[in-house]
């Protein structure tokens, strides 16, 4: 086992080469054709890895050698993912624009090809245990054949796939004050990359590829109307049906238990209704209601394979205590806006939302698959684990805003927001609540008819309070300050120039405490270590552009971007000690990153 720091350096990087082409043509005064094509090649490598503990539920004895209680072996390897892929995107559409009716019909295609199908690691020699000592030293158990063999199993890389979408969208003006819009689309996505061609020869019998099929249908309709001079109405309805029609096969095994791959279908319905009325005293009031329903019906009635012996095997849910097939959320909004004078106006808004769902589904233990519907009382456990996307949630948010123009050339906007989410489930653990605050100011100043100056500043705080099932409480907080200043103008009739300077300061705080049921060892360790340090990020970015009009229908544009970033993140190392993998490989990230981008574009518009 070589000592860390004695090997060669490898700089992980990815190069992207992209070419895009687009054009448009007016066939008639009302009909236009548009087409775009983009080809992007990626080459290089990025950070990736593999880890395993042995024995475990998915690899019991005799696959993994049985060890004494609490003496499981585990290892973590750095395995850079080789990248050599091509993504092609093509879109073509017809646009018709009439006096009252406008419609667009189009096709969009995406084609992904990966020249690397699998990653095949090799473990040469010994590995370190979790304490950084060679396995087998100091009386510990040597590296077992079971763990070595599992670490050397091939790993699948992103497979070839493609998607085809046909869509139709448009709008129609019934009257000068009433307009409707709509969109219909159908997407057919497939994945048929061959297993054997990618180095996988021990798949299910008779199955040559995954045969993935995902069909998505989307329908949306909206209406805006002003039935009265003082009343405006908005209504929207959106429906999306995503059907995962991939075939099932017995891909997975835990000991002697077999189960299939999992498919995930989703139906999503969303609606919005809003009304705005002009009140006396320069007041304008808005009331709105939003509704969203998610139907994951396949979770409550999962597909399965009839094995011919009376058993029907499906996929297995593990690692969580329960899930839900359906959730629905209703939001209520109210806003009051007033123009105090020609120079100043302000608004206050409030949002309240509640989300709940169907009964909880408890995963069945192997060899059974699927889930069983149960009540909250039946599934309750003090340390139960429920994904937050299924948990009940109450949301309250208030927002203040103001617009002020003390002089014609100067405009200022002020914003302040405060919100809180509360989560609940049949457990005392998990995500409890989140909070957010945001304050911002934007400024725009016209130096002259040809020159404009802009500036802004935003400060935000986001917090998450999580009670972990293992006995600690995490109060996670992110503080972010963003400031920018820029200008744009025309020094000459044919020339446009501009510049923007952006500064970002971000700090993630990981405050940790032990709860009353934490072990004495964990309490002592937290007190000694002090918990996790903060993570900080700084970004200073300068953007410059210039555009020259060669002719009425052609331009040339030059962009220059210089970006300087600094990241202080303990994941990559702490106090000068880099992160160490089980084979003594170290990984590091240069905390100071400087990037310069230069782009030149030629723009031609067909008349």
Describe the function of each predicted region.
Residues 39-43, 98-102, 109-113, 186-190, ...:
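Transmembrane beta-strands of outer-membrane beta-barrel pores
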Residues 1-4, 46-78, 116-156, 191-210, ...:
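Solvent-exposed loop segments that connect transmembrane elements
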Residues 15-19, 86-90, 97, 160-166, ...:
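Residues that define the transmembrane beta-barrel architecture of outer-membrane proteins
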Residues 25, 96-98, 172-174, 225-226, ...:
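Residue-level signature of outer-membrane beta-barrel architecture
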Residues 3-43, 47, 63, 77-112, ...:
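Transmembrane beta-barrel wall of Gram-negative outer-membrane proteins
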Residues 20, 80, 91-93, 102, ...:
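Membrane-embedded beta-strand positions in outer-membrane beta-barrel channels/transporters
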Residues 30-33, 100-105, 176-182, 229-235, ...:
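Repeated loop/turn-to-beta-strand initiation elements of outer-membrane beta-barrel proteins
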Residues 590-607:
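Outer-membrane beta-barrel "beta-signal"
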């Amino acid at each position: 086992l070589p000592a860390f720091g004695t090997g060669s350096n490898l700089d992980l990087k990815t190069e992207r080469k992209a070419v895009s082409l687009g054009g448009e043509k007016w066939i008639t005064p009302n009909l236009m054709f548009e087409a775009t094509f983009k080809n992007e090649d990626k080459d290089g490598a990025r950070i990736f890895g593999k880890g395993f503990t042995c024995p475990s539920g998915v690899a019991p004895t005799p696959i993994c050698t049985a060890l004494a209680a609490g003496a499981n072996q585990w290892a973590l390897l750095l395995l850079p993912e080789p990248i050599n892929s091509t993504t092609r995107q093509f879109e073509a559409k017809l646009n018709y624009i009439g006096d009252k009716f406008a419609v667009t019909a189009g096709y969009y295609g995406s084609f992904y090809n990966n020249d690397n199908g699998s990653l095949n690691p090799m473990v040469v020699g010994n590995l370190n245990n979790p304490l950084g000592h060679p396995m087998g030293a100091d009386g510990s158990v040597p590296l077992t054949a079971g763990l070595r063999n599992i670490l050397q199993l091939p790993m699948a890389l992103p497979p070839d796939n493609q998607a085809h979408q046909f869509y139709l969208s448009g709008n129609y003006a019934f009257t000068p004050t009433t307009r409707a819009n709509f969109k219909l689309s159908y997407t057919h996505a497939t994945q048929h990359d061959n297993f054997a061609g990618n180095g996988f020869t021990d798949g299910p019998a008779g199955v040559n590829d995954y045969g993935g099929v995902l069909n998505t249908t989307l329908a949306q309709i909206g209406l805006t109307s002003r039935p009265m001079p003082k009343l405006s109405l908005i209504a929207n309805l959106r429906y999306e049906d995503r059907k995962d029609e991939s075939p099932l096969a017995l891909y997975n095994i835990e000991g002697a238990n077999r189960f299939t791959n999992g498919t995930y279908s989703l139906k999503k319905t969303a609606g919005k209704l809003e009304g705005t009325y002009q009140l006396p005293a320069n007041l304008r009031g808005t009331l709105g209601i939003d509704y969203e329903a998610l139907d994951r019906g396949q979770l409550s009635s999962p597909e399965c394979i009839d094995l011919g012996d009376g058993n029907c095997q499906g996929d297995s849910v593990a690692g969580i205590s329960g899930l839900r097939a359906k959730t629905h959320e209703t939001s209520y909004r109210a806003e009051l806006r007033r123009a105090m004078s020609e120079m100043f106006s302000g608004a206050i808004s409030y949002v309240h939302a509640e989300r709940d769902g169907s009964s909880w589904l408890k995963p069945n233990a192997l060899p059974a698959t699927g889930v069983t519907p149960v009540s909250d009382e039946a599934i309750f456990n003090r340390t139960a684990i429920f994904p937050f996307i299924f948990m009940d949630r109450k949301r309250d948010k208030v927002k203040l805003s103001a617009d002020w123009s003390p002089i014609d050339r100067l405009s200022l906007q002020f914003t302040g927001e405060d919100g809180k989410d509360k989560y609940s489930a049949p457990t005392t653990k998990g995500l409890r609540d989140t909070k957010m605050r945001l304050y911002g100011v934007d400024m725009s100043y016209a130096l002259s008819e040809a020159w404009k100056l802009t500036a802004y500043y935003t400060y935000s705080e986001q917090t998450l309070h999580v009670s972990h099932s293992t006995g600690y409480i995490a109060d996670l907080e992110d503080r972010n300050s963003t400031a920018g200043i820029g200008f744009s103008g025309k020094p000459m009739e044919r020339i446009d120039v501009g510049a923007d300077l952006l500064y970002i300061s971000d700090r993630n705080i990981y405050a940790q405490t032990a709860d009353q049921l934490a072990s004495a060892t964990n309490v002592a360790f937290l007190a000694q270590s002090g918990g996790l340090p903060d993570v900080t990020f700084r970004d200073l970015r300068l953007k410059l552009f210039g555009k020259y009009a060669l002719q009425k229908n052609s331009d040339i544009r030059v962009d220059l971007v210089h970006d300087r970033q600094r990241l202080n993140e303990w994941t990559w190392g702490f106090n000068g000690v880099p992160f160490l993998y089980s084979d003594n490989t170290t990984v590091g990230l240069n905390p100071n990153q400087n990037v310069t981008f230069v782009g030149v574009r030629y723009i031609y518009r067909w008349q």
